[in-house]
Design a protein with these regions (language model features):
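Surface-exposed loop/edge segments in extracytoplasmic proteins
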Residues: 13-21
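Short coil-to-beta strand junction motifs in C2/discoidin
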Residues: 1-5
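Beta-strand elements of well-folded, non-transmembrane domains
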Residues: 7-13
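Short intrinsically disordered coil segments
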Residues: 20-26, 57-58
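Long, ordered, helix-rich scaffold segments
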Residues: 10, 44-398, 402
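Short proline/glycine- and polar residue-rich coil/turn motifs
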Residues: 23-39
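Positively charged, low-complexity/disordered segments
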Residues: 403-407
Length: 407
């Protein structure tokens, strides 16, 4: 197999070094071609120990393992001329920090910061040559789901959420002025336009707003409320509402009420309203979702509405679905059983939210297994739901004989 790797050598000043092979060969467009089991490339005129920036622009669709040090990653995050590797360096640093802070929080310790990561993000925000859409992507920390996959086992969703929220707040505090200035600069004047440049500016503006509000500062919550009220397009209004949705209080409640009143006659937008309320991480979410199942606009006979509310709760809210008391599991299991007779495809899709239960910490793992077993042992299940439950409960280490109850 031939693997083309676009490669660069970064000096300690963050600038690209010239690529000159010691054997006199040329490196066209920075591409090193791997065509053997092992390839060796020796460069000349290398003035100092470089940082290797490899697989730039994701030139080869491969999983790459490297031994880049944290300090080298910080340099790449701040200076690499290749956007993909710059983004990858930020993601790796942030992921490492989050995984470490999850462990610290679970041990009762304070989370740590990575000053080099914060400085790199500051440099990215200050770099006017970068596309706003790219900067917006870089500023978003790895998701809770990504962090859980990185941890792999004994996962505590609450600790992951606290670590991620803490990092977002830290970015918002440390880069407050830069984020505030960028927010102002990214406002798109004039009539709304869906072109790529305007869309990128809106994306960056809304990420800045979200990070600023993550600090919990009242004037930043007020800024989100102001954007919600003054928005002239759905992208900005939804972004402001999603930001407010993360912060309990009068501002969130007022915006949620207003949003429903504005758009109650548009089914697709009402789905978004249900979606947001099911995704908020505060402890009252399950009670709110239960109440919303009685709302005049909700019906178990409307699959889109069920997906928007119960589906989002199950698959898009890892802290509240995976509540330590197991109430989230029971709520979803109950609705799977209620919906299965009339819509087995929808019910099985909801049940698939349990697929990662074995990766959870022991308490949640036991409660999730109990809810799954209750579903599986219910008589007259549809084939769809029975299959999902069976596959979730049986693995290579466990014989399925105890599960072969009559249905």
């Amino acid at each position: 197999m031939v693997i083309p790797l676009v490669t660069g050598l970064l000096g300690r000043d963050g600038q690209d070094m010239p690529l000159r092979l010691a054997d006199g060969g040329t490196v066209e467009r920075g591409v090193l071609v791997l065509d053997k089991q092992a390839n060796t490339f020796t460069f000349k005129d290398v003035r100092e120990q470089p940082v290797l920036s490899i697989n730039r622009s994701f030139s080869a669709p491969i999983k790459l393992t490297t031994n880049v040090s944290p300090d080298d990653l910080r340099l790449m995050a701040a200076h690499d001329s290749d956007p993909f590797n710059r983004w990858q360096a930020v993601q790796t640093l942030a992921s490492t920090l989050l995984v470490g802070n999850v462990a610290r929080l679970r041990a009762g310790q304070d989370p740590e910061a990575d000053e080099g990561l914060l400085e790199a993000l500051d440099a990215i925000l200050a770099d006017s040559s970068l596309e706003p859409a790219f900067v917006a992507e870089v500023l978003v920390p790895p998701s809770e789901a990504d962090t859980a996959r990185e941890i792999g086992r004994d996962v505590d969703p609450d600790a992951i959420y606290r670590a991620r929220m803490g990092l977002r707040a830290l970015i918002g505090l440390h880069l407050n002025k830069r984020l505030t200035d960028t927010y102002g600069r990214m406002v798109t004047p004039g009539v709304y336009s869906p072109d790529a440049d305007s869309a990128g500016r809106r994306a960056l503006k809304n990420v800045c707003l979200d990070l600023l509000a993550a600090t919990g500062e009242p004037h930043m919550i007020a800024l989100a409320s102001k954007q919600y009220q003054s928005a002239d397009n759905m992208t900005d209004r939804m972004a402001a509402l999603a930001t407010l949705n993360q912060h309990e209080g009068a501002a969130r409640d007022a915006a949620m009420d207003d949003f429903y009143k504005r758009y109650q006659d548009d089914p697709l937008i009402v789905d978004k309203w249900f979606n947001l309320q099911a995704s908020t991480r505060d402890p009252g979410t399950l009670d709110r979702v239960r109440a919303l199942t009685k709302h005049a606009a909700f019906s178990l006979g409307n699959p889109n509405r069920v997906r928007a509310l119960i589906g989002m709760f199950a698959q898009g809210n890892p802290t509240q679905f995976n509540r330590a008391d197991g109430a989230g599991y029971d709520f979803v299991a109950d609705h799977v059983l209620t919906i299965d007779p009339s819509n087995p495809q929808l019910a099985s899709r909801m049940l698939s939210a349990f697929k990662s239960w074995r990766a959870l910490e022991p308490g949640r793992r036991a409660r999730a297994e109990s809810a799954l077993s209750r579903v599986y042992e219910t008589p007259n299940l549809s084939r769809d739901v029975q299959d999902i439950a069976h596959r979730a409960l049986v693995d290579s280490d466990r014989k399925s004989t105890r599960l072969n109850s009559s249905h």
